[in-house]
């Protein structure tokens, strides 16, 4: 159990830390739904089962069988001659528009989620990490099939994301 140092004069910071702990617990609860490779178009990410989530406290749903395309050129991954390359994409939605937001390409294991600025006013629903094998052809976001031999893909669902209390207090 977390205890707070009563001698600290920074009571506000202690409260923010406590609220962040609660938020972490709630934020990591499962969101109903799953994602994977598209079936109508294997170049897209598909919502396999409906995703239920909160957007500004309001319940929203992304219907099963919704397929979301990558952005041509912007979401490409350039292959490297000797090192596998990763790129992390987040599936985000505001309940009206659902899209993929790309992080920065990096060596395998070093790619990071896109910045808060890129995520914008959306709820993060899932994470996709694509890896392009070294010495392979590039990943062309508009035409490459996600089950192509030179691509390894991982799909994860996310908990409910919310601003950190320590960021706003």
Please give the residue ranges for each predicted region.
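Beta-strand-rich solenoidal segments
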Residues: 3-169
